[in-house]
């Protein structure tokens, strides 16, 4: 192309990716902010937990808060790879909502530490050294450190595993609190975040399927290897700090859900499934981990989860 030639569409929005545009619009329709939820309402529920149970949820939220960096580093690297504005605009929405997730996790952490920020700092510095968290981070670092040998399709398999597998047991464990009518606001934010991450993983599947033409896909053997490793790590993470008395959560049901979820993502990218686990029982508490069950936050938001608006005009 000569210096005088250019594509006019570079200078205005042109829809090119209907699948990504739909996910972008879905993300916009379901925007929310952490200040719309009143986390202080959950503070009384800390007294309902045993010491083991409280430590378990502190550990879960320690990982979730730290994991935002794993996602955002990858997003920063991926967003520049595509000229299509639909993909760029989708990623702008994802990056925005990831910052909301980060602030939400910080607020929820403080609830479990009874607003003692110093105690949280001490705990986090020790918890991130725990083998169950380090194994996740080291596994991701090993994949990322393959450098130029890691193809673009493999990077998207990595994103599918980060967002679609490495959060699943945490989301499920949090959702079990609802069965005991405690931490209602935390459960509400967990519903919203798990829904967001389902959208994000679906977007990675769409890009992998439709927008990586010219890039050879990894073999089924390679994909299965990565999925099996991720599922094993995720299931081990769940039991690392699980309460000795399983009063709140069903570990077997959550691990089965992790494997079922892996099969679902494999099917979405056209790869044979690995596991025999059935769909979760209808009573399984993680109600919003599928797009089919997506609802707009503002359709069911109530004052119980909203901050107080002061009219000072």
From Swiss-Prot:
InterPro entries: Ferritin-like_SF, HSV_RIR2, RNR-like, RNR_small, RNR_small_AS, RNR_small_fam
Transmembrane annotation, as ranges: 157-177
Subcellular location: Host membrane
Binding positions (Fe cation 2): 98, 163, 197, 200
Keyword Ion transport among record annotations: no
Subunit structure: Heterotetramer composed of a homodimer of the large subunit (R1) and a homodimer of the small subunit (R2). Larger multisubunit protein complex are also active, composed of (R1)n(R2)n.
Record-given protein name: Ribonucleoside-diphosphate reductase small subunit
Species assigned in the record: Psittacid herpesvirus 1 (isolate Amazon parrot/-/97-0001/1997) (PsHV-1)
Classification of source organism: Viruses, Duplodnaviria, Heunggongvirae, Peploviricota, Herviviricetes
């Amino acid at each position: 192309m000569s210096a005088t030639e250019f594509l006019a569409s570079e200078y205005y929005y042109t829809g090119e990716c209907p699948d990504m545009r739909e996910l972008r619009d879905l993300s916009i329709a379901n925007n929310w902010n952490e200040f719309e939820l009143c986390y202080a309402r959950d503070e009384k529920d800390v007294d309902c937990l045993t010491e083991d149970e409280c430590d378990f949820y502190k550990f879960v939220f320690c990982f979730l808060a730290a994991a935002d960096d794993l996602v955002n580093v990858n997003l920063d690297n991926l967003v520049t790879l595509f000229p299509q504005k639909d993909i760029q605009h989708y990623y702008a929405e994802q990056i925005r909502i990831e910052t909301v997730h980060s602030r939400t996790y910080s607020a929820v952490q403080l609830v479990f530490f009874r607003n003692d920020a110093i105690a949280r700092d001490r705990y986090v510095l020790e918890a991130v050294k725990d083998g169950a968290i380090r194994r996740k981070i080291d596994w991701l670092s090993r994949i990322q450190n393959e450098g130029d040998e890691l193809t673009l399709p493999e990077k998207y398999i990595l994103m599918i595993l980060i967002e679609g597998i490495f959060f699943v047991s945490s989301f499920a464990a949090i959702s079990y609190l609802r069965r005991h009518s405690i931490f209602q606001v935390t459960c509400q934010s967990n519903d919203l975040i798990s829904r967001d991450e389902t959208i994000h993983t679906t977007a990675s599947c769409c890009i992998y399927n439709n927008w990586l033409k010219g890039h050879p896909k990894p073999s089924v053997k390679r994909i299965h290897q990565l999925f099996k490793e991720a599922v094993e790590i995720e299931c081990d993470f769940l039991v690392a700090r699980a309460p000795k008395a399983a009063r709140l959560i069903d570990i077997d049901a959550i691990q089965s859900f992790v494997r079922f979820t892996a099969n679902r993502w494999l099917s979405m990218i056209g790869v044979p499934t690995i596991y025999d686990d059935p769909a979760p029982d209808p009573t399984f508490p993680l109600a919003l981990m599928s797009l089919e069950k997506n609802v707009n936050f503002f359709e069911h938001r109530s004052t119980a989860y909203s901050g107080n608006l002061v009219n000072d005009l």
